[in-house]
């Protein structure tokens, strides 16, 4: 029976669709003119078409015609006689497809196929189908009729379809116009009328073996290069290259449309989890994660995921029905209780007879039935195939995936058991079967082969017969597999059986035809066909000979494997559609097309049963998978493959069955890899108007959404894959999340998922593969603590399990473990193991738990075993408890103490029990003490082992103590070490030996350094710290080590620590190009430069070719040429934040043109404000544009904020400002809160849209909350602030004292309401806030608990109250009764006592050693980062009272003791009187000169006495060199007037040393300035900004009439540096200085100044005239620095500022108002200052008083505040 053309046409349409992969959505109805009659004509024509007509090629007839027209010798000739009649049109399918390719009518054709599938799925009625597709069908009929029927429809009036033609074209029936249009635009054109001139029967068709070359030469000449002429293949190649150009574009465009439509459709089906208003998100599944990735442009590796595997798809659900539509059981799931012998016998005859009748109770594909029953309806005189032969060759059905295979097996087993035994049971490899077929064959063969009477116990018998094998193997498969597959067994198997026996043991040998493994998914078992058809049919002669007579197409299919033509049988069909592709030979299309293509077509038109409606993505998924299988790997290029894979992935997501059928288990690792790469990347997207961001802000939002919604999915993937790399990336992403978002993420996850992720982190940490930088360890602890919250109970075992992560936990989280934790020996062992990584505060918290009486009792009763078990915690016991350890207890741990890390007090207690000075083995004792020797006094060291050898072991050990900070370089032991070094001389030490002395480098005198060689000095540089080199040493060393010629970048960078030694001479020796290159290595040292050194560095870049860069409005003709244009300066990036505004103004345009480069620089407040104005930022700038500005956005004006209309946008901008690394300036902060209150008081606030944004506000904003709003904050918001303070305490210290106290009280109220006892846990939570509690709150805290939580700054009020509490009897008692133990217990808290109380402490309790330790501890605190930020009170008087018993005589009638250098180091230089300094030995003074010069507490007489000693050392002052002047420092104040005049002050280096000294008398100021002008020969008008900066404090030595001659241009630049000084100028001098700013070259009229100008000029603003100050606006006032506020003379301050102006001060400005200024203010003015200090909240003493002076204008109604507080309650 000939194949009908109708199913074949459908197949071709399907292939056509899949080749282009465009959407199946119908494009809408077309014209109905052709009518439905065309459909009938089409069907009748197809049925009546003679089969022989298909062997003719109308297209090659056309080629013959057009080629003959170009044939040589016939070009231009007319026809000879009458032309022969045209042959009847013949249609070849590839001709038809070539015509349609690129046509806009592809869309209607694809719509036709989509509707056809919908019709079969009963989603459309036949009427709807015909209505929608009548136009398409009509156009198709026109083409077919024109090709098949002579004299068909006339030529259409509409233009034919081309790849670039109009959209209203029709399907062309004439090949020539179509081809000419397809070739349009090339370099040739047809010049003659084309007529047929030869008999077309002579033209060879596509299948012909011999072509007529003379027919093709003309066309080949047009399409191919000359060298390629002569073959039909060259013709096709040229044609495809010409017309195939748009194919890939159309292919990709279609896929793109499919992907876009699928995204929305799949999204509507699956949905997408999103964070709610609280930041929580219900976790999505893996399909939703993949969809999220597609929507956010993640590049999933679809090949690795399994969606481009190239395997044939499973039969679509649409095609599973048979003719009657009765639901049938799956053949792969037989009833377990029916044995093979009990199954009903199935005859082949009955199978064929019932094919059209009732459905049989088994599933056999129609194609299988058709193939088997061919003998019943023979179409050719070929002999009938033998059913026996069919069953003998049924192997390929057994290994095929087709459902009919099982029916075949059952039928052959029942009818031909012998053949079945031979063909299947005896010769088939057991492992080659699919899973379901393997089970069936196992049962069928077991029924045919009776088990042998006895299976051999040892090796299998020889020969091994199939009967014995199957019987024994099926009886005990595992046992026989072991016996059969042994090496000895395999050798015993006969050669005839070795192949299949080995196959059973090892599985099939891998080759191109090997079947891929079966995959069990949610849809059951899938066993893709991997080439078995080719093996079992083409390679099997019997089956091939039986089947080929009935199916001739198999001959073409099997050509490759049978050694024939290597052309795929479908290549002729698809070749025109697939240009530039590799040969189709290896593709699955050539290997196994039959089982699924013909099987599908045999079922497609017969499906009439009720098929459930299928979603469009499901239908499309099947077609896309079929396309992937047909095209083979790599079709369309990488880009097209990626798009195809994305479409496949999307279409599979809604259907669990399709998704898990394709998804590979190993795809999980690919998902993790893609997510990890996405989390690591920073997306860059430029934005319009030049505001280009370097990082896309939406990327951060998307990553946050990904982590919030899909973390449980990622955790599950991690648990399965154990990807340490992905775990590292994911943990890093969590560590960078805002704490509140991370908390919501963890709390919204399932408990088991969170616990599983914590286990993963623990495993990564144990394996050492989870690495976290120190800066993120705190964040890791926060993440660990959040995950711990998902455990219902924290047990000791959990502590042990998580011990590797314990060092990262906060103390408050650590305290959540039960108090009985330390009673567990395993817990103590874990603490010992991980104590090196634990922080001191963690150990302190655990050590305090040791003191619970119910655990171990009192400290003196602790046994040795317990002491050893808790040894890591002992150094962190409170000192008063540690002192309870007895000598016996201490000596029991003698060998363990050196490595315990004891502090000074603890160490001294241990040393008292371990050191025996009466024995002779002093050196051995010191050796055993190890690091504890650092706490020995000089006297103890001298008695045990005198220091004498600079390279000795004891000396090296002490130097190690100095290196790690245990030993102070300024202490007495260090002085003894320095004596050893000086006595031996540094020149005798090698560079390596000298390097160990680097910790004491700052104490080495200049003369000692001068004696060292250059190699020795260079050897020490790498080990020096920046602060260990004094400025005088830096000047000396830089002058010696800096090459004067050919200085390289590497050489300069190696000297970066010496940059503070910059002098005019060294700066001149450094080429500017080297300075520019060294910017990155010098940047860390720039903050250590003096103001004058910074100015000189900037001046270096202002001078080009000897010409200084001046402004156009310079100060005068001496320095500026009228009309001169400023010369652009190229500034190194590291210097830009140091530029004065005047210099920044010159180059602002060049900077802003390249602002993307500078968006991360730490611009100052005034620089950011200035550049913001210069940018002229439009009001409609988006948040993304603002983020692109980086730190420049910190200069945002209040007006810009006020013009933001949307509340949501306003909050987003505020959030962005608080995320900047630079601190929010005071005026902008005040503007934010004022604007926020105004918006919240509006009649209709945008409450409906504000909610989600409020939850994202940063806790930094809450920390900055005005005091007046703090009382109404929610408890959750307060806790967010407390957590921020614990993480970043420096942010707390940036607040005013009033703000700190208000926040501390509010936090305590939240944690422990009134009448509630305050526990240690509460104070642990408060952390740094404890030291700012008020008096009443402090007295409510148990004192012992309070004293153990005072490791941070102490507010003035708190410190005063604490000092009173320390003197209570229950604590330390009266000071006059103190002993050394009480002093050691008090530690640095002794300075909280009053001066009177300190003076009462007995002398015996304050020995030299105790004093030295106490003062060292206080000095170490003051020099620490936190101590410098704390801004503690001046302690000079208290320190003097503390050391009075040592430095003062015991009785008034006794002379003062003469101190030596050791005494000075044991106390402090200011403790010595002028008499004592004068009487010191010269050598002692020389050794302590650096200490005297650096002590700012010296009175006016002491410097004079010290300078008397210095002159004895160095001679008269006129001989002092720059290094000596720098070393003397403040001692120069002690010079007499004549001596001061003799100092050499020629260059700015020496001048700046004197300019930095505060405390000169007015006479001395005048002498210094006069001497400099006289010696340098300069006039005041010629002073540039470097020398003006160098003058510093001495600028006030110029008279008013001299000040007016200063260049306003130069002074405006120096204002940045001079404005930071509290100049001792008179009011008249300050007014003259301030007047310079309004002159030409300055900043212009004061009324035009912005706040940035007031910030720039600093304290010089105090000289602005009264009237000008009185006229300042709110914004201008807020630019005045707090220091400038404090230096305004009190009478002037009271006159110029009104109460309204004073109330507009920022809180930091109001706090700077001095008591002297307050004394001059009126009551209304004082209330205004108090209002500003409390940020709008009345101070306690002002509550209830009237505010009639006008503050109502600056406040808000009470109901407005209620709204504001309500808004702030939503901040969580």
Curated annotation (Swiss-Prot):
Keyword Magnesium set for record: no
Main subcellular location: secreted
Q: Which residues are glycosylated?
A: 65, 427, 476, 565
Record-level GO cellular component terms: cell surface; extracellular region; kinocilium; stereocilium tip
Subcellular localization(s) per the UniProt record: Secreted
Q: Which residues form the signal peptide?
A: 1-25
Q: Read off the Pfam families from this record.
A: Stereocilin
What InterPro entries does UniProt report for this protein, alphabetically? Stereocilin-rel, Stereocilin_LRR
Keyword set, alphabetical order? Glycoprotein, Secreted, Signal
Q: Which GO terms describe its biological process?
A: cell-matrix adhesion
Coiled-coil stretches, from where to where? none
The family classification in the record reads: Belongs to the stereocilin family.
Protein's name according to its UniProt entry:
Putative stereocilin-like protein
């Amino acid at each position: 029976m000939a194949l009908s053309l109708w199913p074949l046409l459908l197949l071709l349409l399907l292939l056509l669709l899949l080749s282009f992969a465009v959407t199946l959505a119908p494009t809408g109805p077309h014209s109905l003119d052709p009518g439905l009659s065309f459909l009938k004509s089409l069907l009748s024509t197809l049925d009546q078409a003679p089969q022989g007509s298909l062997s003719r090629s109308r297209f090659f007839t056309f080629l013959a015609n057009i080629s003959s027209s170009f044939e040589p010798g016939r070009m231009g000739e007319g026809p000879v006689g009458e032309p022969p009649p045209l042959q009847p049109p013949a249609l070849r399918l590839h001709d038809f497809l070539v015509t349609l390719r690129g046509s806009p009518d592809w869309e209607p054709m694809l719509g036709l196929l989509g509707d056809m599938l919908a019709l079969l799925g009963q989603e459309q009625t036949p009427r709807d189908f015909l209505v929608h597709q009548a136009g398409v069908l009509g156009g198709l009929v026109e083409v077919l009729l024109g090709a098949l029927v002579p004299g068909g429809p006339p030529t259409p009036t509409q233009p034919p379809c081309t790849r670039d033609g109009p959209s209203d074209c029709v399907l062309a029936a004439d090949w020539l116009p179509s081809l000419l249009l397809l070739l349009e635009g090339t370099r040739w054109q047809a010049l003659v009328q084309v007529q047929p001139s030869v008999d077309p029967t002579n033209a060879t068709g596509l299948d012909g073996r011999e072509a007529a070359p003379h027919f093709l030469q003309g066309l080949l000449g047009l399409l191919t290069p000359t060298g390629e002429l002569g073959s039909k293949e060259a013709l096709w190649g040229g044609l495809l290259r010409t017309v195939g150009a748009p194919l890939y574009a159309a292919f990709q465009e279609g896929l793109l449309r499919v992907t876009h439509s699928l995204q929305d459709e799949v999204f509507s089906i699956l949905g997408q989890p999103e964070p709610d208003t609280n930041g929580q998100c219900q976790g999505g599944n893996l399909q939703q994660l993949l969809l999220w990735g597609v929507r956010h442009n993640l590049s999933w590796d679809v090949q690795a995921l399994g969606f481009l595997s190239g395997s044939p798809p499973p039969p679509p659900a649409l095609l599973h029905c048979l003719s009657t539509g009765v639901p049938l059981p799956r053949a792969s799931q037989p009833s377990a209780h029916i044995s093979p012998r009990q199954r009903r016998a199935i005859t082949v005859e009955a199978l064929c007879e019932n094919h059209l009748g009732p459905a049989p109770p088994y599933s056999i594909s129609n194609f299988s039935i058709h193939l088997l029953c061919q003998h019943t309806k023979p179409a050719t005189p070929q002999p009938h195939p033998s059913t026996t032969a069919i069953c003998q060759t049924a192997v390929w059905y057994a290994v095929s995936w087709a459902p009919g295979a099982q029916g075949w097996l059952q039928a052959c087993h029942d009818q031909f058991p012998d053949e079945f035994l031979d063909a299947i049971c005896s010769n088939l490899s057991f492992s080659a079967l699919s899973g379901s077929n393997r089970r069936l064959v196992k049962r069928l063969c077991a029924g045919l082969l009776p088990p042998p009477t006895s299976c051999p116990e040892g090796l299998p018998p020889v020969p091994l017969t199939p009967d014995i094998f199957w019987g024994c193997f099926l009886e005990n498969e595992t046992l026989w597999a072991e016996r059969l597959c042994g090496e000895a067994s395999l050798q015993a198997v006969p050669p005839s059986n070795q192949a299949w026996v080995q196959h059973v043991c090892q599985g099939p040998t891998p080759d191109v035809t090997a079947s891929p493994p079966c995959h069990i998914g949610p849809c059951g078992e899938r066993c893709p066909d991997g080439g078995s058809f080719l093996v079992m049919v083409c390679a099997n002669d019997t089956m091939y000979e039986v089947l080929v007579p009935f199916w001739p197409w198999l001959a073409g299919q099997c050509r490759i494997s049978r050694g024939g033509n290597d052309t795929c049988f479908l290549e002729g069909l698809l070749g025109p559609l697939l240009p530039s592709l590799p040969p189709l030979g290896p593709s699955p299309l050539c290997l196994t097309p039959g089982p699924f293509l013909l099987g599908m077509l045999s079922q497609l038109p017969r499906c009439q049963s009720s098929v459930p409606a299928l979603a469009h993505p499901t239908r499309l998924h099947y077609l896309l998978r079929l396309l992937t299988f047909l095209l083979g790997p790599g079709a369309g290029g990488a880009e097209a493959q990626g798009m195809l894979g994305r479409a496949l992935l999307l279409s599979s997501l809604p259907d669990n069955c399709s998704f898990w059928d394709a998804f590979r288990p190993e795809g999980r690792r690919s998902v993790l890899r893609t997510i990890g790469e996405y989390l690591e990347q920073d997306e860059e997207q430029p934005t319009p108007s030049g505001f280009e961001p370097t990082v896309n802000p939406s990327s951060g939002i998307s990553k946050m959404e990904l982590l919030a919604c899909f973390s449980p999915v990622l955790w599950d993937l991690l648990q399965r894959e154990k990807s340490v790399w992905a775990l590292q990336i994911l943990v890093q992403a969590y560590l960078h999340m805002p704490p509140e978002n991370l908390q919501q993420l963890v709390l919204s996850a399932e408990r088991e998922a969170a616990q599983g992720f914590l286990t993963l982190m623990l495993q990564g940490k144990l394996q050492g593969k989870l690495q976290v930088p120190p800066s993120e360890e705190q964040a890791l602890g926060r993440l660990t603590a959040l995950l711990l919250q998902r455990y219902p109970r924290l047990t000791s075992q959990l502590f042990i399990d998580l011990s590797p992560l314990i060092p990262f936990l906060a103390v408050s989280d650590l305290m959540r473990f039960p108090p009985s934790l330390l009673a567990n020996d395993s817990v103590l062992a874990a603490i010992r193991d991980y104590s090196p990584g634990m922080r001191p505060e963690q150990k302190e918290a655990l050590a305090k738990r040791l003191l619970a009486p119910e655990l171990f009792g009192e400290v003196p009763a602790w046994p040795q075993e317990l002491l050893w078990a808790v040894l890591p915690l002992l150094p962190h016991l409170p000192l008063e408890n540690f002192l309870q350890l007895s000598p016996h207890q201490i000596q029991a741990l003698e060998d363990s103490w050196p490595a315990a890390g004891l502090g000074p007090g603890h160490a001294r207690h241990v040393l008292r029990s371990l050191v025996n000075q009466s024995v002779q083995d002093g050196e051995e004792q010191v050796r055993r003490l190890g690091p504890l020797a650092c706490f020995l006094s000089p006297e103890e060291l001298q008695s045990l082992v005198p220091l004498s050898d600079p390279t000795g072991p004891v000396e090296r050990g002490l130097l190690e103590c100095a290196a790690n900070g245990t030993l102070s370089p300024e202490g007495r032991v260090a002085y003894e070490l320095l004596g050893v070094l000086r006595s031996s001389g540094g020149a005798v030490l090698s560079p390596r030996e000298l390097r160990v002395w680097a910790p004491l480098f700052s104490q080495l005198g200049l003369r000692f350094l001068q004696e060292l060689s250059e190699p020795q000095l260079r050897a020490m540089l790498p080990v020096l710290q920046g602060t260990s080199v004094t400025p005088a040493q830096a000047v000396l060393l830089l002058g010696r080590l800096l090459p004067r010629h050919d200085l390289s970048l590497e050489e300069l960078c190696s000297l970066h620590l010496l940059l503070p030694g910059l002098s005019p001479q060294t700066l001149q020796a450094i080429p500017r190009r080297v300075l520019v290159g060294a910017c990155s290595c010098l940047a860390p040292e720039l903050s250590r430069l003096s103001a004058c050194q910074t100015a000189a560095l900037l001046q270096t870049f202002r001078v080009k070719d000897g010409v200084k860069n001046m402004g156009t409005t310079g100060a005068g003709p001496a320095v500026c040429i009228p009309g001169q244009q400023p010369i652009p300066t190229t500034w190194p990036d590291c210097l830009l934040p140091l530029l004065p505004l005047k210099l920044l103004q010159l180059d602002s345009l060049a900077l802003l043109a390249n602002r993307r480069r500078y968006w991360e620089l730490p611009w100052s407040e005034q620089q950011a404000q200035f550049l913001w104005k210069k940018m002229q930022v439009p009001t409609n700038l988006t948040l993304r544009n603002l983020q692109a500005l980086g730190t420049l956005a910190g200069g945002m004006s209040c007006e810009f904020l006020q013009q933001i209309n949307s509340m949501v946008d306003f909050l987003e901008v505020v959030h962005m400002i608080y995320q900047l690394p630079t601190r929010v300036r005071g005026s902008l902060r005040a503007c934010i809160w004022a604007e926020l209150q105004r918006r919240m008081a509006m009649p209709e606030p945008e409450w409906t849209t504000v909610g989600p944004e409020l939850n994202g506000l940063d806790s930094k904003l809450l920390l900055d909350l005005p005091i007046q709003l703090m009382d109404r904050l929610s408890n959750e918001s307060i806790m967010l602030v407390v957590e921020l303070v614990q993480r970043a305490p420096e942010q707390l210290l940036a607040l005013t004292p009033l703000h700190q106290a208000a926040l501390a009280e509010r936090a305590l109220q939240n944690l422990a309401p009134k009448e509630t006892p305050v526990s240690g846990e509460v104070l642990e939570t408060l952390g740094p806030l404890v030291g700012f509690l008020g008096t009443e709150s402090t007295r409510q805290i148990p004192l012992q608990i309070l004293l153990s939580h005072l490791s941070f700054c102490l507010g003035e009020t708190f410190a005063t109250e604490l000092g009173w509490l320390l003197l209570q009897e229950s604590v330390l008692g009266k000071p006059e009764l103190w002993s050394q133990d009480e002093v050691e217990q008090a530690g640095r808290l002794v300075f909280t006592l009053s001066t009177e109380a300190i003076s009462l402490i007995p002398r015996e309790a304050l020995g030299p050693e105790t004093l030295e330790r106490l003062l060292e501890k206080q000095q170490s605190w003051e020099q620490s980062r936190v101590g410098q930020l704390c801004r503690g009170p001046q302690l000079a008087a208290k320190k003097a009272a503390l050391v009075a018993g040592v430095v003062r005589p015991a009785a008034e009638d006794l002379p003062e003791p003469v101190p030596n250098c050791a005494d000075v180091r044991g106390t402090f230089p200011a403790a010595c009187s002028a008499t004592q300094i004068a009487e010191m030995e010269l050598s002692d003074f020389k050794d302590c000169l650096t200490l005297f010069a650096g002590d700012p507490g010296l009175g006016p007489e002491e410097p004079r006495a010290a300078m008397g000693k210095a002159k004895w050392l160095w001679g008269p002052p006129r001989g002092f060199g720059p290094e000596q002047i720098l070393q003397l420092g403040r001692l120069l104040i002690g010079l007499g007037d004549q001596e001061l005049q003799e100092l050499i002050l020629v260059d700015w280096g020496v001048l700046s040393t004197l300019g930095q000294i505060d405390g000169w008398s007015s006479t001395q100021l005048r002498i210094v300035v006069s001497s400099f002008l006289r010696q340098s020969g300069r006039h005041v008008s010629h002073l540039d900004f470097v020398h003006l900066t160098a003058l510093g404090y001495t600028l006030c030595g110029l008279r008013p009439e001299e000040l007016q001659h200063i260049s306003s241009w130069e002074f405006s630049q120096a204002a940045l540096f001079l404005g930071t000084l509290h100049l001792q100028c008179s009011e008249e001098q300050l007014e003259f200085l301030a007047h310079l700013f309004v002159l030409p070259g300055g900043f212009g009229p004061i009324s035009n100044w912005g706040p940035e100008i007031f910030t720039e000029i600093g304290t010089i603003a105090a000289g602005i005239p009264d009237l000008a100050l009185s006229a300042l606006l709110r914004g201008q006032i807020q630019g005045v620095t707090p220091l400038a506020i404090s230096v305004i003379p009190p009478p002037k301050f009271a006159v110029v500022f009104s109460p309204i102006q004073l109330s507009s001060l920022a809180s930091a400005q109001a706090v700077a108002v001095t008591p002297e200024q307050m004394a001059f203010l009126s009551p209304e003015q004082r209330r205004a200052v108090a209002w500003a200090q409390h940020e709008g909240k009345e101070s306690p003493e002002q509550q209830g008083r009237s505010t009639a002076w006008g503050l109502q204008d600056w406040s808000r109604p009470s109901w407005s505040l209620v709204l504001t507080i309500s808004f702030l309650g939503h901040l969580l």
